[in-house]
Design a protein with these regions (language model features):
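N-terminal Rossmann-like dinucleotide-binding module
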Residues: 1-70
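Active-site-adjacent beta-strand anchor residues
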Residues: 31, 56, 93-94, 117
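Structural motif corresponding to alpha-helix initiation and N-cap regions
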Residues: 38-39, 60, 76-79, 124
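Short glycine/serine/threonine/alanine-rich loop segments
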Residues: 50, 72-73, 112, 139
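Short, Asp-centered acidic motifs that coordinate Mg2+ and/or phosphate
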Residues: 54, 74, 89-90, 140
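Short acidic low-complexity segments
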Residues: 74-86
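Beta-strand-loop-alpha-helix segment that lines the small-molecule cofactor/substrate pocket
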Residues: 90, 96, 101-142
């Protein structure tokens, strides 16, 4: 049993070191600035050193606060601005579930990679449409 514990501990150290050494060359955007994003997702992205170029939210009042909180990040209310930026390779989406389908549709049409919180949509018909878009644009969806 002692050997198994040593092996598990060794693997955990290796995994943590590997995560810290990973260097992301691409830039990403994040849509949404709610409690779940702030408490769970942004800290993980920071820990993994994922370079965010944009944070998008509905409220223009929050834009200066976002830029002050996240150095080097451009805050915007425009998803289209993000999707037009060729430097952005992927978009993380964590908004109200009712908005997921519309945002995911635009991201997939742009050809960018998409990470979307569950549920990605609100009906089987919408899911079928998202899957068709994913195939048509050869997009990565997580």
């Amino acid at each position: 049993m002692r050997y198994t514990k040593q092996l598990i501990d060794r693997y955990k150290r290796f995994r943590n070191t590997s995560l810290l050494r990973h260097d992301y060359h691409d830039k990403y955007a994040f849509v949404g600035i709610g409690n779940h994003s702030m408490n769970n997702l942004y800290p993980v992205l920071a820990f993994l050193h994922v370079p965010l170029k944009y944070v998008c939210c509905k409220s223009a009042d929050k834009l200066p606060l976002i830029e002050r909180a996240y150095a080097g990040v451009h805050a915007t209310t425009s998803l289209q601005e993000i999707l037009a930026d060729e430097e952005v390779k992927g978009v993380f989406v964590s908004t109200a579930p009712q908005a997921h389908f519309a945002i995911a549709t635009e991201v997939l049409k742009s050809g960018k990679a998409l990470f979307i919180e569950k549920p990605p949509c609100q009906s089987l018909d919408e899911l079928a449409q998202l899957l068709d878009l994913q195939k048509a644009h050869d997009a990565i969806v997580e």
